[in-house]
């Protein structure tokens, strides 16, 4: 039994709604200066891709075939894993920078307290 809404499968509706919500949130974060222009572009590409792959599932298979990957789902899983590793690396860099900032701040506070 296939769940559908009109002509669309339920996952297509959910994927499209999530993609549109992601676009709205991305623009809101950009307006609040919480995302850089490059970050906005990256998120827009991601959310538009979610919408495209949701509305046209064979599209992922065509891209997979162009890249020499067997199935569209395999392609999406590979992209998801690579994206997760990229985000993990970005988080690592952010934590490392924050750790350095905290170390410098603690050092400055210690020097000020020592001088007083």
Swiss-Prot record:
Q: Which organism is it from?
A: Methanothermobacter thermautotrophicus (strain ATCC 29096 / DSM 1053 / JCM 10044 / NBRC 100330 / Delta H) (Methanobacterium thermoautotrophicum)
A Pfam family that the UniProt record links to this protein: DUF2304
Listed A to Z, the keywords are: Cell membrane, Membrane, Transmembrane, Transmembrane helix
Instruction: Say if the entry is tagged with keyword Protein biosynthesis.
Output: no
Q: Where located?
A: Cell membrane
- Subcellular location, principal: membrane
Name the family: To M.jannaschii MJ1580.
The annotated topology with respect to the bilayer is: Multi-pass membrane protein
User: Does the record carry Secreted as a key word?
Assistant: no
Q: Which GO terms describe its cellular component?
A: plasma membrane
Where do transmembrane segments lie in this chain?
Answer: 8-28, 39-59, 75-95
Q: What is this protein called?
A: Uncharacterized protein MTH_137
This protein's source sits in the domain of life called Archaea
**Known InterPro entries for this protein?**
DUF2304
